[in-house]
A protein has these predicted regions:
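Active-site acidic/histidine proton-transfer and metal-coordination neighborhood
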Residues: 1-98
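Acidic/histidine-rich catalytic cores of soluble enzymes
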Residues: 54-166
């Protein structure tokens, strides 16, 4: 099950980590429809949190379960995810969870990062991880060989998130 898998990943991280600082596991927040954030999902998260608490007591490694807002998922923006975590879990439970703040996803959903950071602080939700994706901006002065190199990356293997604007 997903719970068992996540607990095994946490065990492995605790074994491999050379420090007890900044440890986290990223995961998708509850699936891709609103029914996913149900009591069963909350119960499953609580099982993982209980494992992380026990692991922390046993090893000294404090690992956060970091939920990442995903465009088109149950929680497509960080603000809604922060609200959900703040209202569905206790302060003690939230010591072992937080969000994985993906700046690319934030751009796709048109979220202001300053607002997300202040909301997380205000609602006592940890930013357990920050993902900073790099992006390329095409300069019309690129030589033809550079354009060819970029065209090789135009493949679904490399596709992640994108945003377009029309001026």
């Amino acid at each position: 099950s997903r719970v068992d898998y996540t607990c095994r990943v946490a065990d492995l991280l605790a074994q491999l980590a050379t420090s007890d600082k900044g440890l986290s596991i990223s995961t998708c927040p509850f699936g891709y429809d609103s029914a996913a954030a149900c009591e069963q999902s909350i119960g499953n998260v609580r099982l993982v949190v209980a494992h992380l608490q026990e692991l922390h007591q046993r090893t000294g490694k404090h690992i956060h379960l970091a939920f990442e807002a995903e465009p088109c998922a149950c929680f497509s923006d960080s603000g809604a995810l922060i609200d959900y975590l703040a209202t569905s879990f206790s302060d003690d439970e939230r010591r072992y969870m937080g969000i994985c703040f993906d700046l690319c996803h934030s751009a796709v959903t048109d979220e202001a990062y300053e607002k997300v950071l202040s909301q997380a602080e205000r609602q006592n939700v940890t930013i357990a991880k920050v993902q900073i994706s790099s992006a390329l901006q095409r300069d019309s002065r690129l030589c033809s060989s550079s354009i060819g190199d970029l065209e090789e990356l135009a493949d679904s293997t490399y596709f992640h998130d994108f945003i377009t604007s029309h001026w």
